[in-house]
Structure formats: C-alpha cells, structure tokens
Amino acid sequence: MSTVFEEDVTTKSALNVTEKEAIGRVAAGLVTNDDFVFIDAGTTTAAMIDFIYDNVRATFVTNGIVHAKKLIQKGLKAYIIGGQIKLTTEAVVGTEAINNLRKYNFTKTFIGTNGISVKGGYSTPDVEEAAVKSEVLKRGRNNFILGDHTKFDKEYAVTFGILKDACIVTDELEDNEFREHAVVKEAFA
C-alpha cells in the first residue's frame, strides 16, 4: 500500500495514545547523561518528551516546534533547527533545516515514521520531511525509529531509510520478519 496523504497533528495525536505513551516511555529511558540527542517532530516522539527525566544532563536538538517548547519547559537544554515550518506536522523542514543538521553528530536520534515495511523501509508521504529524516539518520550514532503497530506493513510515497539503519521501538510486533532486518524493542513485551 502506498499513499501520499498525511493527517494533521491534532488528528494524529488522538490516535493510539496508550501505545504512543508506552513507546515514549521506552525511548525516553534510552537517553542518558552526556547524550547529544535529536528528537524528530511527530506525535509519538512528542510523547517521549513527557518521560525524559528532568535532571538528565543531555542536550537536545529538534525540528518540532511543540517539542522544543516541551523540552525547555522541563528545564532541559534544547535547540531547534532553522528552516521552513510545515503547518500540518508542525515540523521544520527544507534545505535550511538540512544544512543546519549537517553540523551535528548525534549520539542518539529518535525519529517518527508513517510506514515501516520490509521492502520499502521507513517511509513518509512528504518529500521534505523525508529529506530531513534521511539526513538525521546519517548524523546519528544510535538511531531509533518510533512507531506503533499500525505503522507496520505500510509504505508511503518517500523512503527515508532501510530497516537496518535503526532500532525500531514499538508497542508490539507480531510479524517476526521485521526482526530479521532490524533490532526491535517492544514496549508491551
């Protein structure tokens, strides 16, 4: 299945809330002192921020407008990259965003996705968001894709990475074929 449509943040934030919180809790637990972390825009990555310890000595970079606000409200050191703002996803995208990212070397990255498939890898409907995600994957030492069970076996218009590029953090995974191509951490396991 391939699609080019993407729902807005308000709609997506109401979907699979329990799953996003569970994934967010696991992902937040991966952040440690002295990490230099990228957090992608998106509703699952936003849920992660709620579970990051307030006293963690890490630095965060994000392309999510809401994410930057949530990070600084927790008293965490945060930067937001520059670029064009996309209203639908509240993400910073475009050439300027990619150029901003090229100066960073992240210890950990946490990236959202619309689709995860064995054949199509990690995908999203938007070319500009895919370009940002692809650059982040290149800049990260340890990459994590955050996606609930509804993202599996879905393919969108633009692939931004292959399965082996990142560890998948999900709520539950029934199809073991994905484990042959990527490390998978399950929140409900």
Region spans (language model):
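Glycine- and other small-residue-rich loops at beta-strand/loop junctions that grip anionic moieties
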Residues: 16, 37, 60, 90, ...
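Short active-site oxyanion
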Residues: 33-37, 55-59, 141, 164-167
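Short beta-strand scaffold positions
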Residues: 39-40, 62, 170
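Conserved phosphate- and dinucleotide-binding cores of soluble alpha/beta proteins
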Residues: 66-189
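HTH-adjacent hinge/linker in prokaryotic transcriptional regulators
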Residues: 1-38, 49, 53-54, 71-76
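Short glycine-enriched, charge-decorated loop/helix-capping segments at active-site entrances
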Residues: 10-14, 57, 122-126
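Electropositive phosphate-/nucleotide-binding environments in soluble metabolic enzymes
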Residues: 14-21, 25, 42, 91, ...
